[in-house]
Amino acid sequence: MKVGIIMGGISSEREVSLASGESIFNHIDKEKYEVSKIIINNKIDILEKVKGLDFALLALHGKFGEDGTVQAFLDIMDIPYSGCGALSSSLCMDKNLSKKVLKAENIRTAKWITVKSIEEIDYEKIEEIGYPVFVKPNNGGSSVATFKVYKKEDIKNSVMEGLKYDEEVIIESFIKGREITCPIFNGELFPILEIKSKADFYDYKQKYAANGAEHLPVQLEKSLYDEVKEMALKTFEVLKCEVYARVDMIISEEGVPYILEVNTLPGMTATSLFPQSAESRGISYSKFIDLIIETSLNKKIK
């Protein structure tokens, strides 16, 4: 089977994607698959470089990769690929839209507003949300251009910076508490990990530095675990996720869980959360890649 690891891309998360792709290449069973690295440098590359593949193993992140566009191209070309489909990928990449779906389904998520320009900033609504707030690109990832803002005077500059990366910026309530991630594979919850950041919040550096943050299997009290599990699986379902995705949450100091976001192409670097969760379940990195390929192919057949 000819498997192409699709990596690189044109988003602000290109370097993370390249790291994920290299890590997958180093761990995939090369006796089982005929493997090639396919580095995307511009949009047209996807049309030219995937020809002849039996399977596309996606290691892309951010725009034109995690947002459904590449998935749609591959659907048109009838090439099976890993993970969620075009609709789910697009929906989860758009934080505003995904939060609207969660709210409509009575799934708890932090309060938020969005703006598309400096002129649209509604300081009264931000006051209602309450400082501090997070300001970040609506379609961003890996905490690129994400700012924790404590006062009104700093909102404008943070929004301006976010608008450099996306046409819409989300301003979201900060919830103090324990950050956890719920890896879901084929509709099943894998071991939950707690993220213990060494900084004020889990930013880009904390996510990808070798010693940036601790990722620890967490034991939750049963009633809380049951609630977290139900929320995570329902989120996976209502956002139309397939094969695998990571549902990030925060548990407030009062013990109330909130959905933060859903990652439809979770990182696959040496420090990434999903491979660590699989490992704690006794699934090696190489075996996990096998499972992703097998389950994704079964999805395509259905």
Swiss-Prot record:
Keyword Cytoplasm applies: yes
InterPro entries given in the database record: ATP-grasp, ATP_grasp_subdomain_1, D-Ala_lig_Van_CS, D_ala_D_ala, Dala_Dala_lig_C, Dala_Dala_lig_N, PreATP-grasp_dom_sf
Cofactor binding note of this UniProt entry: Binds 2 magnesium or manganese ions per subunit.
Residues annotated as binding ATP: 126-181
Protein name per the record: D-alanine--D-alanine ligase B
Cofactor: Mg(2+); Mn(2+)
Catalyzed chemical reaction(s): 2 D-alanine + ATP = D-alanyl-D-alanine + ADP + phosphate + H(+)
HAMAP family recorded: Dala_Dala_lig (MF_00047)
Keywords: ATP-binding, Cell shape, Cell wall biogenesis/degradation, Cytoplasm, Ligase, Magnesium, Manganese, Metal-binding, Nucleotide-binding, Peptidoglycan synthesis
Broad EC category: ligase
Subcellular location: Cytoplasm
